[in-house]
Structure formats: C-alpha cells, structure tokens
C-alpha cells in the first residue's frame, strides 16, 4: 500500500507532509521551500504556473493570476462574501450556470475546485518526487467551520487532481494531533486551537486524553468565520495606502490592476515586517504617471498604525472563542494550552488579544505554517493502519436539519455532535392525499430555514392517498467521518425510499468532475509532451555542437562528399530545432548520427593509433629503464621516475 500523504490546502500557502519512520516530515517543493504559495497563473501559451513562479509574475499578469481561491470553493455567486470579494480581486469572478462562483481566465470559465486541484497536483508531485513513487491517496484539511458544500467541493478538487481523498479533516484538529503527539505530556488536558490563516478563522476546544494507552483526541466544540483571515488584513493596508497616495498626489490607484498588484505585494511584505519591527517603509517607484512625469509611492507605516487598521478584524475572532468555550461546557480557566496556527498568529497584536482572552500566554513551540499538514499526515498513518494508538473524535460544526411547515428549520443533528453520526425522525404530510414530499436540507443555526445555507433537496414520491398527518415518513441524516452528509427518506407504509449524498444544490455534477479529471490528465500529458520536446531540443543542440567540433578537428580526413553530407544533415537538424515538432527533431538527429558515422570511424581510428603509439613508447621506456631513462619519451620518463622515487622515499 502506498503512502497516504497529508495536505494542508491553504488560502495563502499550502504544505504537504508524510510519515517516515514513525515521524512526520514536511516535504520541500521543487523550489526548496517547505510551503507553497496557493497561487496559480494561466499563461498565454496555455502553460499553468503554480506556487512561487506564479506569484513572481503576478504584477505583470494580474487578471490571470489567481490567489485566495479557497474563499470561493463551494460558494454561490450571490453570497454576500463572494460579492465583497468581486470588488477586491483583480481577476474576474463570474456566475456559473449552477449558480456557483467561478472564475473567468483567458475566456474560459473555471470552477474553484478545478483551480484548487492545480495546487493539490503540485503537492502530489512534491511528495512523489521525494518518495520516488506514485502517490494516489491523501488526507486533506479544511477549516473546521467549512459547511457541507465546501467540504464536498474540496473532496472534488482532490479527485480532479488524481487523488483518492481518504479523509477530510478539520485544520484545528490536525494541529492538535501534531501538538499532542509532539509536545503533549502525559495525562488529560484541554487545549484551544486558535487558527487564523490567510482566509479563514477557526477556534476549536479539544480534549486530549490517555485511554488505556491510546491517545484520544475529542473535539468538544468548534466555531469560526470562513471569510476572515490574512487577505482581509492585507486589504485594510491596501485601502490605507491607496487613500494616503490619493491625499498626497490626487491620483486614484484602485482602478490600475498592475499598480494594485504591486501594492498588494507591498502590503503583505509590510504586514510581515511589522511583526518583528516597529516601523517599515512601503516603496514602489514609478507607480503612476502625472503630467507626463513618473510618480513614486513612498510611505512609512508603523506597527501602531497597522494595529489600528486591523483592530476590528482581530476583535471579530473573540466572539467565536466565547461561543466555543460555552458550547464545550468548559470555563476559560479549564484550558491548559493555547495553540496558535496560521501565519496571521505571528502578529504580536493577535497574540496579545489571545492572551487577554484566555488569561495565559499561547504556546510558541508549534510551527503555525506546518502543524496542520503534519496532523493530516498523522491521520493518514492512522487510516493506513500504520498507527493504532490514536483515536480522533471530531464534530460537525453547524446544525443540520430540514424545512418543515411554515418554513421552520427542524434540526436533526445539533452543532458540535461527534461524527460519524446517524439520526432518524418521523415526519408526515401537510395536505390531504399528498402524493409526494420534498425534503429540503439546510445547515446553520437560524430558527427559520431561509436564514440558513440550503444544501440540497430531493423528492419522495408514490405516497398512497391518505389524510394529512397520516403517512409516516422516516427521514434519516447520516454524517460520515469526512463531515459529509447523506440523507434518506422512507415511507414506512410502502417501504419506498430515496437517498442522496448531499451535494450543494449547485456543486459539480459527476460529468463535470469527470471532464475536469480528464482536463487535468490532458494537462499532465501536455506537460509530459513539453518536457520530452525540451529534452529532444537539448539533445539536438548537443549533437549539433559535438558534430561540428568533430568536423573541425577531423573533417580534413573525410572525402568532400561525406563532409558535405554531414554539413547538410546538421543544417536540416538546425532548421528542425527552430520548430516544436519532436518527431522531426528526432528524425533529423538520427540523420546527423547516421551521416556522421564515417567521421566517428575516423576519430576512433585516430584514437587507436595514438594509444598504440603511446603503448609502444611505454614498452621501449620500460626495457631501457635499467640502462638509461633518457632513451624513453619524456612523459613516460616522468611517470617511471615518480614511481621509482615513491618507492625509494618509503
């Protein structure tokens, strides 16, 4: 059985880890970095760049460079969070036929799952390069507060990338696994995982217990905000820079895509620098033109200023913390350790806010960028059976229910219920002789169904005619270990039933997923074709160079006709190398090799002659050694002398 890898698919950065010799290992990517920017760029020639190369060219290609795509995964175009992003992102967010938020790139509409799959493919390749074998199975992490549609979409992204997603695991839970196995001492303890990443915020209260030598991780509660993270912090700085520049120069940079991309890079840099210094300078020369002259952006920003810009965002994380503590049935003083996860937790003000709320310093010995991927790899080793001393009990983050008479949300499974779980309840009809019922499934905490997230609907037909309230329809909710919901309805009188795996009533259809899988495979084929073409080019170039060199040295030993034949073959190969037809390059390379055969024979004969002459000279030298060294060749003489002296010196 191959390795099950652990992937942290992040909004800003992604990371991949494996278990090796019982220990987790984070794998460096092809650029030598342990994390990969979650950035994808679509080039004019059809090439797709992922990670650092994509991020580097973002300034010159803003409309086709996609980042923070995780904020759109499993979301509808009309959701207010998506509408907010439309005004902020340089790329074009569009409405798909199924109502989802997709992205338009180079006249093609792409689903967030398809784009995220490119990052997952890069993570898969990173692991394969390290292991030297194909990887097909993975555990992928999601924010704990992701709803069913977002989890399903993440799983679909894995499929498109060619991965069998063995488990979807919550990010804070993964971080707790990494902490518990590495730093967690003996005995029972309660920990809070505060996870503020690039696009999402989660808080989970987790109990780590030692049960008969087995380490048990039980999630007591979870809460969060799937649209709050580092990207929002960056946006506050971007808005501030644009406003200040406008005040000083009277120019509005918010409509200039290239200027915006430069400001975004500067804002992110400034945010990171202000975690370790009190002041930084934002310096972007030639940012705009005014009256035919260039205008430069030069602005000092202090840590205090940054904190005032983002204070409201940081305080937005505290209410979910309060709710999570309450839902877990514990007091703040019961928490033994606070684990910080996500790059944003490096910000001193965030650490200070967490300390003020929990009344103790958060731990600093967990790597906020890598802990989640490490936890995913640990869970992978549990699923593959390599590790048996560990049990993970996670929860569903939001209540699940169906719409009943009057638009009421009747909750079937309450939030923070340990998963996997199953629950059944009997319902009846609202009208006389009602032949069918529509089961509408919702997720959320509001009392009325319309205020919650609609996950899907299906019909149960063929109910025998009877008075309202008579038929007995049993509705069953079943949540698997991935947190994905399966719903069934059964008419107890007839035994008729209907079941569905809830997919967002938008979501991707099986046909769409299959098509995207094929597209991804075609891309892989195209990558392979380009690689083979590059290799053929390199070999062709090397052949031209070596044949030319040999022709210069030994060409005078050839007949004129043979020499011309070789030169003509080289010229044809050079012409083929200007194009991109691998078959033509291979054919012309073979022709050069055939034409240069006589040249090779001449070179070989020449070398043989030189060696023979050298050997003959050596024999003569050896025979005369007893009489006089002067008779042999000078270099032979040197060799013999050296040997002779070595022995003498001993």
From Swiss-Prot:
Induction: By stress conditions e.g. heat shock.
Basic and acidic residues composition bias: residue spans: 626-650
Annotated positions of the Phosphothreonine modification: 200
GO MF annotations in UniProt: ATP binding; ATP-dependent protein folding chaperone; unfolded protein binding
This protein's UniProt keywords: ATP-binding, Chaperone, Nucleotide-binding, Phosphoprotein, Stress response
Composition bias, Gly residues: 615-624
Region (Disordered), start-end ranges: 608-650
Function: Acts as a chaperone.
Family: Belongs to the heat shock protein 70 family.
Protein name per UniProt: Chaperone protein DnaK
Gene name in the database record: dnaK
